[in-house]
């Protein structure tokens, strides 16, 4: 810490504190997205994506037996939402000073310190109760990848856009994968298809 060279500036405005709060909000925004992505990727097991398997921290849903609720994702996203609200309050407080005096520092300080504490606790719980126990679901990932119609894009250089679109439409209409649709239409044999769509080399 050091003494300011311009006391009037710091009494009239708390820009630096507002900047600190904005950085906390940016972190909260990133964590909010991460928690929502995990929640979507772990949805299932039959009607969702189910490419991630999350720990079962609670007995399950009180309504649906056997259901695994993404409680840690929900908890973290609620904390992040609260912090976004705190940041908005800080920005209003920082803009609300009167001439050479901003009397909103107690609100600003409270929101910053509370946000740090809330986010720190939420991150710790998220790591211990979800991240360390999360697992990939290779079987479902492979199934979803093989059934993805978007892979048809890789066939365009070989057979052209129109034929590739025809393959995608047939695969969708008959609930078959792209390889089966391609062979059925006679545009490529199995070996040529595997050479064109090699998912191991697409990343």
Regions found by a protein language model. Name each.
Residues 1-203:
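Conserved, well-structured ligand/cofactor-binding cores
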């Amino acid at each position: 810490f050091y003494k300011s060279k311009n006391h009037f500036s710091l009494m009239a405005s708390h820009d630096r504190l507002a900047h600190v709060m904005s950085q906390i909000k940016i972190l909260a925004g990133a964590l909010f997205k991460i928690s929502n992505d995990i929640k979507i990727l772990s949805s299932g097991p039959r009607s969702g994506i189910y490419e991630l398997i999350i720990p079962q921290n609670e007995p399950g849903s009180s309504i649906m037996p056997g259901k695994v609720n993404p409680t840690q994702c929900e908890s973290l996203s609620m904390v992040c939402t609260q912090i976004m609200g705190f940041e908005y309050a800080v920005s209003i407080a920082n803009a609300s000073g009167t001439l050479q005096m901003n009397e909103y520092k107690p609100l600003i300080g409270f929101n910053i310190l509370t946000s740090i504490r809330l986010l720190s606790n939420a991150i710790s719980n998220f790591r211990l109760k979800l991240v360390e126990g999360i697992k990939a679901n290779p079987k479902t990932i492979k199934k979803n990848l093989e059934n993805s119609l978007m892979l048809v894009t890789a066939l365009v250089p070989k057979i052209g856009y129109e034929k590739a679109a025809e393959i995608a439409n047939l695969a969708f209409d008959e609930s078959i994968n792209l390889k089966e649709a391609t062979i059925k239409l006679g545009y490529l044999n199995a070996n040529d298809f595997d050479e064109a769509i090699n998912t191991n080399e697409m990343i």
